[in-house]
Amino acid sequence: MPEGALRNFTINFGPQHPAAHGVLRLVLELDGEIVERVDPHIGLLHRGTEKLIEAKTYLQAIPYFDRLDYVAPMNQEHAFCLAAEKLLDIAVPRRAQLIRVLYCEIGRILSHLLNVTTQAMDVGALTPPLWGFEEREKLMMFYERASGSRMHAAYFRVGGVHQDLPPKLVDDIEAWCVAFPQVIDDLDRLLTGNRIFKQRNVDIGVVTLAQAWEWGFSGVMVRGSGAAWDLRKSQPYECYAELEFDIPIGKNGDCYDRYCIRMEEMRQSVRIMQQCIAKLRAPDGGGPVAVQDNKIFPPRRGEMKRSMESLIHHFKLYTEGFRVPAGEVYVAVEAPKGEFGVFLVSDGSNKPYKCKIRAPGFAHLQAMDFISRGHLLADVSAILGSLDIVFGEVDR
């Protein structure tokens, strides 16, 4: 056969592919079954979030962040609130910090549970997602009992959180923390030593540490390659500095290492949650759940019924919003997917002049080409599963 008669085969992976994790379209160039090139086509879920935020007050902007990484919504709200608080130069009360950290760790478990179990489903294991969704249902109930919503919570506020947690809710979260490690152990037994699962993940999608830094990776993708880089330890925010937890790291940088890290991070998140609950119950864990400045946070209902000034403050906050001093700030949090950053520019008005969102999944998806090269077609879904990509934040 003449050389010119051989040509590579180009196929579409997605946008409706069950392993495509949302609306991803990959154009794959195949030589037989070997992947030669991967071309991700994004933008199918683009909603112009950054532009829409410019026309909203700081309070109205918060719900947009729930819709980015919609698997762990409160972690994104956290970054935006921290950025606005830095520009306003206000200190968040300790109880509000503890509640925020508690719910951010619930978000981390929500995200990792979904990722680990769907990664297993992508390579053929059907039981883990059923167990994972059962636990996620319980966690979403905790979201609902705190904020009134299962997914798009809009619970964080600039200066604190919307409302305090009822004591019964704190008790139920504590009881869940006691029972949940058993579920992780069950998943562990099902997957970690499983021969088929290991064959599909070990030495697949290897990323060296140098490559991870070059491509702007963060979170599990960097820790899987051997760097103990976690913003909760390296640049502690809120009350993470006083909490004890370990940072698991991998040594091979493959899909299996990333899976193992997510499993261990869920255990560490439970540890953090238990410490937060203990601190919430301690004598110094009481107090307000938001700043007591009525120019930023609305007064309580009881005050509004007694005081005309409180009523005026409430009306002005919900119609016009508060003004943020002019300036710019970049704040990043350790979201479940990696470093989620918000670059906030204020012109001194009641609306953000610019809000640039740094989504970790965006950097991870652009590396899909170099990670997948030389692998088989069947490995593409395993690699995609281990990158942990959610399209809300990639397309924004």
UniProtKB/Swiss-Prot annotation:
Keyword Disulfide bond part of the UniProt annotation: no
Primary location: membrane
Record InterPro entries: NADH_Q_OxRdtase_suD, NADH_UbQ_OxRdtase_49kDa_CS, NDH1_su_D/H, NiFe-Hase_large
Enzyme class, spelled out: translocase
Gene Ontology, cellular component aspect: plasma membrane
Catalytic activities: a quinone + NADH + 5 H(+)(in) = a quinol + NAD(+) + 4 H(+)(out)
EC number of the protein: 7.1.1.-
Subcellular location: Cell inner membrane
GO molecular function, one term: NAD binding
Topology in membrane: Peripheral membrane protein
Keyword Metal-binding: no
Keywords: Cell inner membrane, Cell membrane, Membrane, NAD, Quinone, Translocase, Transport, Ubiquinone
Domain of life, per lineage: Bacteria
Quaternary state and interactors: NDH-1 is composed of 14 different subunits. Subunits NuoB, C, D, E, F, and G constitute the peripheral sector of the complex.
Function of the molecule: NDH-1 shuttles electrons from NADH, via FMN and iron-sulfur (Fe-S) centers, to quinones in the respiratory chain. The immediate electron acceptor for the enzyme in this species is believed to be ubiquinone. Couples the redox reaction to proton translocation (for every two electrons transferred, four hydrogen ions are translocated across the cytoplasmic membrane), and thus conserves the redox energy in a proton gradient.
NCBIfam families: NuoD, PRK06075.1
Family: Belongs to the complex I 49 kDa subunit family.
The protein's name in its UniProt record: NADH-quinone oxidoreductase subunit D
Organism field: Rhodopseudomonas palustris (strain BisB18)
Gene (name only): nuoD
